[in-house]
Amino acid sequence: MVNVGPSHAAVAVDASEARKRNISEEVFELRDKKDSTVVIEGEAPVRTFTSSSSNHEREDTYVSKRQVMRDIFAKYLKFIGPGLMVSVAYIDPGNYSTAVDAGASNQFSLLCIILLSNFIAIFLQCLCIKLGSVTGLDLSRACREYLPRWLNWTLYFFAECAVIATDIAEVIGTAIALNILIKVPLPAGVAITVVDVFLIMFTYKPGASSIRFIRIFECFVAVLVVGVCICFAIELAYIPKSTSVKQVFRGFVPSAQMFDHNGIYTAISILGATVMPHSLFLGSALVQPRLLDYDVKHGNYTVSEEQDKVKKSKSTEEIMEEKYFNYRPTNAAIKYCMKYSMVELSITLFTLALFVNCAILVVAGSTLYNSPEADGADLFTIHELLSRNLAPAAGTIFMLALLLSGQSAGVVCTMSGQIVSEGHINWKLQPWQRRLATRCISIIPCLVISICIGREALSKALNASQVVLSIVLPFLVAPLIFFTCKKSIMKTEITVDHTEEDSHNHQNNNDRSAGSVIEQDGSSGMEIENGKDVKIVYMANNWIITVIAIIVWLFLSLLNVYAIVQLGMSHGDIS
């Protein structure tokens, strides 16, 4: 028998501890290696150790991606506003009238026209954003600057007709809502709608207002828009249980039913009510305050003290407006703002505007279709039916939504009229005088109609106004497509100092002829002037967008030809 002494036991323990230390060191060494794993097997269950550096990298990547998404979302929130303002043009009282008529005569089959109109509206509004962002001009000022005088005045005539037709719909719709809700006579209702004129006349001053005030103004309009959406979300809960959801969704697919009961004429009315001409001027103008705010904050655009001294005879408001109208965005501002402006507008139109228009038609189609009241149905009729067949609250909520739409649309239409007159004509008047004269041009026909015609003619006047809007639409879309396709207009300049160039670029620049422009993949060029490079970046439409724009214009024009022929054959009877 061998006796193991204390020294031998100590040696055995030391050897065991050393072995454990070696294993631990190997484990930690393997942990530090990227994407390495180690498995230790013993009496205990198998344990796996994954590289800690890999875990940290994955965690850092996740955190960085999450931070990027937060930054993108925070930046997007800064651009919310113009899309809501433009969306008002697509949920005005004219939409109520045409959608009610479509639902009563064709039930849900014309939902596909609303969807198509929404896509066309988004496409055209993106062109408006592009024009306003690159040139710093709204559509009316671009017409005055780049078109012959006679053509500019012709387009001004069509634009003013569009504003007047829109005002007629807004005023009549608001007057009807006030008449039903609080029993206000129609002429008095028209007079009440003039209040929003003074609200705009004395508050909305794009050149003299800060970006913060403009955002507050946008929030005011946004509250009205959200109120309309809430009303129709509640309204849909009141529709008959027998309404087939499958049949509703089938309406988004073209069918033969859409041609029944003069459906093409109704479709043209929907197109005119959805793709509003005055929204083209509005969309191209609303993008500019954020561009200007970016350039002012980054020191890219200022008015010198010398200029202020020269202009001291002018009022502060006139100086600020002149600064605003002379502004041209820098390339940095365009890159920062344009994409987010397009995304914000597209999301708003494809959610809020599409939902409201479809909801109006679904409510009308589920309550009026195949009913004795369907023939000649108007806003009064649908209120009576909703109140009698569904619930009194249903009719009240519908009229409340109409009132909110009329008020918000009246505000936006006043802004559009101001943009049109100041852009096309460039009146040499005080700003408040221009706004008052602009509104008087539009409000007088509304007063005449509200006083002289009865309830039976109101629906026809509303639908006719939407057909007028559809007819003038191609004339106002044409210059928008022309401007955004022309490289000499859709361009911006970037100035680069030679001293900041490296030797290789400096040598290449010396080989260029002074004053020459060199094309770079058709999108940019370089011009040398006073020892500095002026890089020209072209942002005109590519051939795909150009083809789509031409197809849209031809489609609108063909529909207008059909509408004019139908009016001629029916001797002006649009019933």
UniProtKB/Swiss-Prot annotation:
Positions of post-translational Phosphoserine modification: 24
Q: Where are the transmembrane segments?
A: 71-91, 109-129, 157-177, 180-200, 219-239, 267-287, 345-365, 397-417, 464-484, 544-564
State any GO BP term from the record.
iron ion transmembrane transport
- Source taxon at top rank: Eukaryota
Q: What induces it?
A: Up-regulated under metal starvation conditions (at protein level). Down-regulated after addition of manganese to the medium (at protein level).
Q: Does the keyword Cytoplasm apply?
A: no
The record describes its membrane topology as: Multi-pass membrane protein
Crosslink Glycyl lysine isopeptide (Lys-Gly) (interchain with G-Cter in ubiquitin) sits at which residues? 33-34
* Topology feature Extracellular, residues: 1-70, 130-156, 201-218, 288-344, 418-463, 565-575
* GO cellular component terms attached to this protein's record: fungal-type vacuole; plasma membrane
Q: Does the keyword Membrane apply?
A: yes
Q: Which UniProt keywords apply?
A: Cell membrane, Isopeptide bond, Manganese, Membrane, Metal-binding, Phosphoprotein, Transmembrane, Transmembrane helix, Transport, Ubl conjugation
UniProt catalytic activity? Mn(2+)(in) = Mn(2+)(out)
> Which Pfam families does this one have?
Nramp (PF01566)
Which terms in the Gene Ontology molecular function aspect does this entry carry?
Answer: cadmium ion transmembrane transporter activity; inorganic cation transmembrane transporter activity; manganese ion transmembrane transporter activity; metal ion binding; solute:proton symporter activity
Q: What happens when the gene is disrupted?
A: Decreased manganese uptake.
Where does the record place the region Disordered?
498-517
Family, similarity comment: Belongs to the NRAMP family.
PANTHER family linked to this entry:
MANGANESE TRANSPORTER SMF1, SOLUTE CARRIER PROTEIN FAMILY 11 MEMBER
Q: What does this protein do?
A: High-affinity manganese transporter involved in manganese uptake from the extracellular environment. Also contributes to cellular accumulation of other divalent metal ions such as cadmium, cobalt, copper, iron and nickel.
What is this protein's record name? Manganese transporter SMF1
